[in-house]
């Protein structure tokens, strides 16, 4: 079975998840926005949180949306304002996950993401959602990925 992890990481938490899943045999694709985030962490939180709150999509640099060679696709996103990040909103709009076994890995400062989980379960009934509390700060959270 071929498995793919598509993810966005702004602070490095997603990169740790990607390394862990790659060691489990996943192919990995990191998405990068065309526009750089603000340098100020406060502005990143304010602008990203607002944009995620309204479901904004962000143009991506060189994103390959073709997942036809994969049986299972796992999407990784930081949680912004209790929602998926804007780059991952774009991934979900561009990527055909029909006939795939989608699963999601969310990395949240609080370790919970009920709003994001609810939206994902509505859009992808039966999809697996794993929420991690900041893997950079709490590396033991990565053990939850063994369930994928």
Model-derived features: positions:
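Short glycine-rich anion-binding loops that position phosphate/pyrophosphate groups of nucleotides
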Residues: 78-81, 109
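Short beta-alpha junction loops
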Residues: 106-112, 135
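Glycine-rich, charge-decorated loop segments at or immediately adjacent to ligand/cofactor-binding or catalytic sites
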Residues: 110-123
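Glycine-rich phosphate/pyrophosphate-binding loop and the adjoining helix
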Residues: 128-148
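Short, charged, surface-exposed secondary-structure boundary motifs
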Residues: 37-42, 114-115, 136-142
């Amino acid at each position: 079975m071929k498995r793919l992890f598509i993810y966005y990481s702004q602070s490095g938490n997603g990169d740790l998840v990607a390394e862990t899943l790659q060691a489990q045999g996943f192919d990995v694709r990191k998405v990068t926005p065309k526009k750089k985030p603000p340098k100020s962490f406060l502005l990143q939180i304010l602008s990203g949180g607002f944009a995620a709150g309204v479901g904004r999509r962000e143009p991506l640099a060189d994103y390959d949306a073709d997942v036809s060679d994969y049986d299972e696709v796992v999407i990784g996103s930081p949680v912004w304002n209790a929602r998926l990040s804007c780059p991952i909103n774009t991934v979900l709009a561009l990527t055909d996950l029909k006939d795939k076994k989608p699963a999601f890995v969310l990395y949240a400062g609080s370790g919970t993401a009920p709003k994001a989980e609810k939206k994902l379960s509505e859009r992808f009934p039966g999809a697996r959602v794993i929420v991690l509390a900041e893997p950079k700060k709490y590396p033991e959270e990565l053990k939850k990925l063994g369930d994928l």
